């Protein structure tokens, strides 16, 4: 068996959270799903308050997981583009379910924004 697969949690929900379990990864997934291929700075602008280091780290993690494809063009200055792989595109129903749930939550009387995490 593949050693990477052996390290995944037995629970499929936990496996999914391991792969896209932080807010930055979900926002990267959202933007690449909505926009298609994007350059690093476009992605950074689209997400908003994400540092270059955090974006780089999360893109590498998602690339290693097979969710994001990184293409480097031999140009001066260098150009790098990111897009979703087929596996990344297969997460679109998960994103859509999150969108629907979020919209429904915002319609609830007394809906509260989440507390800021320390």
Task: Please provide the spans of the model-predicted regions.
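A basic, often C-terminal nucleic-acid-binding module that engages the phosphate backbone, implemented
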Residues: 69, 86-87, 92-93, 108-118
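Canonical helix-turn-helix DNA-binding module
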Residues: 41-73, 77
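Alpha-helical linker/hinge and terminal dimerization helices associated
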Residues: 30, 65, 94-108
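Basic, amphipathic "hinge/linker" alpha-helix immediately C-terminal to the N-terminal HTH DNA-binding motif
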Residues: 74-98
């Amino acid at each position: 068996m593949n050693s990477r697969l052996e390290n995944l949690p037995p629970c499929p929900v936990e496996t999914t959270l391991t792969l896209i379990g932080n807010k930055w990864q979900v926002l990267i997934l959202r933007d690449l799903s909505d926009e298609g291929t994007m350059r690093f700075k476009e992605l950074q602008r689209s997400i908003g308050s994400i540092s270059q280091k955090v974006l780089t780290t999360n893109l590498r993690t998602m690339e290693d997981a097979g969710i994001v494809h990184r293409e480097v063009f031999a140009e001066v200055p260098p150009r790098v583009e990111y897009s979703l792989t087929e596996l990344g595109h297969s997460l679109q129903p998960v994103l859509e379910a999150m969108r629907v749930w979020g919209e429904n939550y915002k319609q609830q009387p007394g809906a509260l924004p989440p507390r800021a995490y320390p």
